[in-house]
Amino acid sequence: MDNRSNALNAALSQIERQFGKGSVMRLGDPGLIPDIDVISTGSLGLDIALGVGGLPRGRIIEIYGPEASGKTTLALQTIASCQRMGGTAAFVDAEHALDAIYAGKLGVKVEDLLVSQPDTGEQALEITDMLVRSGAVDLIVIDSVAALTPKAEIEGDMGDSHMGLQARLMSQALRKLTANIKKSNTLVIFINQIRMKIGVMFGNPETTTGGNALKFYSSVRLDIRRIGAIKKGEEILGSETRVKVVKNKVAPPFRQVEFDILYGLGISRESELIDLGVKNELVEKAGAWYSYNGERIGQGKENVRQFFLENPKIAGEIETRLREKLLPHRQGEKIAEEVNAAE
């Protein structure tokens, strides 16, 4: 046994000399597995469903869903959260459709946001790789995978066949990006669209664009859907949205959450505080009346939402208590401190 231990130690020493310290490590070494560093999605319910309080840094994330389901809104809210924590964010706008005014309404500091509108898919992914390798960018959003058009397709004629070209481009880029993303602790979000497979009789005919590579390289995959409209009389104020965590490498997957996206305002934090507060018995509900700490705060959900908007301190207190209760102990406390500091 001693001979084997000596041989292993000699091999480890040689590997460290050749490839640098930390090339091979024991998982039990102190400080090797730090707390997962996260960026909030802007939705309290989704942060809790993700199990770690947000989207994990140093990982690849995929957000996909039908048109007008809230994919870009969710990504922009994550950018706003990143900027509130003092981070730097970049938006690779392959669709050439970023609305700066809308982004500003969601809380994005537009003047500080790095934006690129590349001509080809290769250019977009090369820019992403250079930003990741700089180590100075905390969050990069690519909108969207479907718009990452290979150079050969752009230079070719309409109707030319380019079988599998985009899938090969994505596969090659992700092989190159993954290690750099981990080293730089950058969060990279790919927004993706849905397509239908032809001739599927049984099972789900839906698939995402860009081949299978992104499915494998993603640590978290979020399926976002619009499930209804929020109305005031005949006027539509927003969308009821459902997000399912279909893949999660950092916590248990398959959790789902519902929240409201209000047009021009983004994800309604106050509505989530009401729903989660009642569910976790932090906010009492008797008939149409809501109470907190024994004091009535409003009649009807809309009035309570208005109360939280006018009293951000109480809203912040409820959010902190929810995070500490529903997230892993150390993670919940850490994120609650960051949320309070940002406010």
Curated annotation (Swiss-Prot):
It holds the Pfam family RecA_C. Keywords: ATP-binding, Cytoplasm, DNA damage, DNA recombination, DNA repair, DNA-binding, Nucleotide-binding, SOS response. It is found in: Cytoplasm. GO terms for cellular component: cytoplasm. Its main location: cytoplasm. One of its GO terms (biological process) is SOS response. SUPFAM superfamilies: P-loop containing nucleoside triphosphate hydrolases, RecA protein, C-terminal domain. HAMAP family: RecA. NCBIfam families: tigrfam_recA. This is Protein RecA.
